[in-house]
Amino acid sequence: MRGKPLLQAKQGAQSFLGNLGDQDQASVIFFDHRVYPPIGPMQLGPGRAQLVSRIDGAIAEGGTALYEAIQSSFEAANERAHQDSSRIHALVVMTDGRDESSRITLDQLLSHLNAENSAVRVFTIAYGDQADPRVLGRIADVGQGSFAKGSAENIVQVYEEMASFF
């Protein structure tokens, strides 16, 4: 992802954070052919600018370890959900590609999402034509979230609609 699509994706994610409250917490996890350590979780009041800045500085590399990124993020969110059930715990996953780098399969991921006694919901966004809407829809369905399709023209709106769930 480069140029306008990357810029619009960043603006969408930043808009999503802007629509959350100061008392909300968020993490940002980047992935390409591997999953990077999370930035956060942090309370958005004091931490929003840092998360927005990190999103602004993101670069797109090759490869997509989508399933591993979802699994590791889900595990971390599930752990936080068990520690604090008073909050909404959810993943919002945006990808512009199909998984090609994970060491787990889609079926393994879906089993993991389905097997957990979890209050974590998984929302997915297919960005552009290379992402697989069928797979992302299944992940969102098993994760008790929702799926949306985004493009450079509407990704900010898609993120704003996702924020309305929170």
Residue ranges with predicted function:
Residues 1-25, 30-123, 129-166:
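Exposed acidic/Ser/Thr-rich ligand/metal-binding surfaces
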